[in-house]
């Protein structure tokens, strides 16, 4: 059986983080899960494109907008399943076995963890994971794996710069189930803006969007 999953990664000047993200996908290739990686670039001026090509990824380009980039990226894929992963997210070792065991149960995401120490990082991640469990509304930082048919029926990602992940999650018929494997994501925005301020901003955006 051919590998079922196409991976889509949106990038915008992501050269510093992209190699580690791509490296974490290698176990999915070894497990026969991943058939292709599509990098959807929003006009990077750094080496993001060169890095993607060096790793064997396909590149699609267009205007910088997370939703638009993801929509273009998914449109370029051929797999029966789609995995969406941010360019600063590293999947925990062992993720491929968990996906392989659970994917027939429907769409899934990973458990959020930040590449940062301290109580604030753990608290924000715990809240995000609880929200995913209760409402089936993971953020894009947690990754997403779903059938292409479910994606198509949902209407796909809207071309919008924010909350595109929540918009898609709300339109999917099946609840998104969280797996124990962690998606370790960068904490730069939280560390620059402050954990409390950034967390409150995200919550406010979510409440206004819903």
Write out the residue ranges for each language-model feature.
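Short aromatic/hydrophobic "clamp" motif used to bind/position activated sugar donors
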Residues: 82
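Short, well-formed alpha-helical segments that are part of the catalytic scaffolds
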Residues: 13-29
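Cell-envelope/extracellular polymer assembly enzymes that use nucleotide-activated donors
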Residues: 4-6, 36, 167
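Glycine-rich, basic loop-to-helix element that forms the pyrophosphate-binding segment
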Residues: 61-77
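A short, conserved alpha-helix in the catalytic core of glycosyltransferases
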Residues: 150-154, 160-178, 182
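Short beta-strand/loop segment that forms part of the nucleotide-sugar
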Residues: 23, 33-43
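Conserved donor NDP-sugar-binding/catalytic core segment of glycosyltransferases
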Residues: 93-120
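A conserved acidic beta->alpha catalytic loop
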Residues: 41-49, 89
């Amino acid at each position: 059986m051919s590998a079922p999953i196409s991976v889509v990664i949106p990038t915008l000047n992501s050269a510093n983080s992209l190699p580690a993200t791509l490296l974490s996908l290698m176990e999915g290739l070894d497990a026969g899960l991943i058939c292709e990686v599509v990098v959807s670039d929003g006009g990077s001026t750094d080496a993001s494109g060169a890095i993607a090509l060096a790793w064997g990824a396909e590149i699609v380009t267009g205007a910088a907008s997370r939703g638009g980039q993801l929509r273009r990226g998914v449109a370029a894929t051929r797999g029966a399943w789609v995995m969406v992963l941010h360019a600063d997210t590293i999947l925990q070792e062992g993720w491929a076995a968990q996906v392989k065991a659970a994917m027939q149960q429907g769409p899934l995401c990973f458990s959020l963890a930040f590449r940062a120490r301290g109580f604030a990082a753990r608290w924000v991640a715990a809240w995000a994971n609880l929200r995913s469990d209760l409402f089936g509304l993971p953020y894009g930082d947690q990754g997403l794996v779903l059938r292409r048919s479910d994606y198509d029926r949902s209407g796909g990602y809207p071309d919008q710069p924010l909350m595109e992940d929540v918009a898609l999650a709300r339109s999917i018929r099946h609840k998104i189930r969280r797996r124990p494997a962690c998606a370790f994501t960068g904490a730069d925005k939280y560390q620059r803006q402050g954990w409390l301020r950034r967390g409150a901003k995200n919550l406010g955006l979510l409440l206004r969007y819903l």
